[in-house]
Each structure stands twice: as structure tokens, then as C-alpha cells.
Amino acid sequence: MRSVSEEPVPLHEEFIYCCGAATHVLKCGPWKDLSKDESKNLPRLLFMIIPGNPGLAGYYRTFIKALYCGLNQQYPVWVVSHAGHCKPPSGMEMIEDTDIKELEDVFGLNGQVEHKLNFLKKNVSKDIKLVLIAHSIGCYITLEMMKRASELQVLRSVLLFPTIERMAQSPQGKLMTPLLCKLRYALYMPVYLLSFLPEGVKASLVRFALRGMKTCDESSITTSVNLFSVDCIANILYMASQEMMKVVERDSTTIKQNLKKLIFYYGTGDSWCPQNYYDEIKMDFPDGDIRLCEKGLRHAFVLDASKEMAAMITDWLRDDLTKL
């Protein structure tokens, strides 16, 4: 595998309805359709990114491009937003999904799991193997996907900064739980008022909020402007409130059943999944591939370390890919 290239990367962008919810999909590579209808030219493997929260696909734009190049442009790399976390551009045609029934609560944590499973069922052939790369709460969603759909041909699941247990008890969770569970509605009016600002002013506000970072991915700034939408922020905060209440006990049974397929990557200063969570899971699963970050990467690595993370993942998966 070669290092990340600066050459142009084919990137396809689409907005669809999945389970009745607006969904943003970014696809790296020439493959736009991986359904069974085009089985003759299908790749053997799909890399699918399950985002954190906020689950906007645009945050992972640089990451999937870097990963695609690091994989020698041999495999498609897709990222699927969480249901309702995207604001479709005005005038952009939405592709209606008529084959999948609407979920009762697609914006909640359970609904987001079913949303990803339904997306795969509709858009990816069963013959294609999967590498699931999950970030933050996406790791919880990925473990649930593997639990509920054992028929998925998952070659590997890479769980980055995994929030898979005791979220409300984490340092950040203790601060955010009261806000998310009791006071989140108070944020809607300020967001509504800010939504009327010109796009340039919104971008300036985002830059100001991220001013403490030495370098910040430009696509992260552009994507963050979407947070000035009441619909998006309501769905983001609602999902986050459910995370605090529902992500309590680690699903050690599912981890044990899939241990050989899993790679865990914990941070050293992560206030959402502190290092003692790493110490405990490492003790419980001594034979697991459970790593501790030695590079000082932040939980929200997509803000400034997408290329570095992509390079590490391609190195981790080198042996698996040579066996295909």
C-alpha cells in the first residue's frame, strides 16, 4: 500500500431517503452502485464508515479520500450519515427510497442501527465483504449491527475511540448528560435565530469556535455550517440524549463472539472513553486487538488528523487484505 496521494480522487455525493430520513452518502472510487443488479463488476470488499455524533458525512471527506488512496484505490470507501443529521442542499434532488418501510423512531439510537442495516440491504450486494470503520458512538452502532445481522460478511471492524459503555459516567458525559437530557430544547431558539445569518458569517463563527486548533480540516468547517439548522441539531441532540441513557454496559458477549474481527483504538486523554475503560477491556479480553493511541490524537480526529488515522488503518489491515 502506498502513502496517501495528493492526486484527484473520484468522489460521488448523493442525498437519499433511507427509512424515511434524509441521508447523505459520500462514495470514494468509481463504484456508484454496489447492489446485486450490477454483480458482474462488483469489488470484493467495501469499506464503510459509521460516523460519530454529529453524524455528518462531510466530516469524513478527507478521511475517506486518504483511506481510498492508502488502499491503492482498489476498494470503494463509503461514509453514510446518521439519519436526519444532514441538511440537503436546496434544489438538490432527493432520491426517494420506496422499498424500505419507515422506522417508528429512526432518529433514536436503535433507529440509527436499523438505518445502517437497511442501507446495506438496499445498496450493497450480500456477496461483498465489509470492513466497518466506526468512530465514537458509531462503534456502539457497529457492534449492534454485527449482533443483529450475523449474516453480514464482516472481514474486520475497526472501532476508533469507542463509546460503547458508561457514557454518562465518563468525564464528558457527567457534564453533558444534564444538558442533553433536560436542557437541550433551550438550544433550539438560538440555533433557529443563527440559521438566518449569511453562510460566510456562519463559517466565521465555526472558525472562531475552533480557533484553539493549530490546523483544522477545511471540510470540517464547511460541514459544521450545517449545524445551524434546527432540524439537524434537534436530531443530533436527541440521539445524544439517548446515548447517555442507553449506552451503559459494554456488550461483552458480542465482543467475545466477534473478537477476531475487531480492532479497538482508545485515546489517552479521551474524556468520552477514558483510559481506565481501555485498561478494563484489555484485561477482560487479553487476546483482543486493543490498542492505545501513542500519538496524542483527539477524540474528534476528523478535525485535524484524518490522513494520519487513515495511514494507520491501512497498515493495520495490510495482512487481511493480502489474503483476499
Swiss-Prot record:
GO cellular component: endoplasmic reticulum; lipid droplet
Protein keywords: Endoplasmic reticulum, Hydrolase, Lipid droplet
Gene Ontology molecular functions: sterol ester esterase activity
A Pfam entry, by short name: LIDHydrolase
Organism: Gallus gallus (Chicken)
Source domain of life: Eukaryota
Family: Belongs to the AB hydrolase superfamily. LDAH family.
Protein name: Lipid droplet-associated hydrolase
Active site residues per record: 136 (nucleophile), 270 (charge relay system), 299 (charge relay system)
EC annotation from Swiss-Prot or TrEMBL: 3.1.1.13
Xref: InterPro entries: AB_hydrolase_fold, LDAH
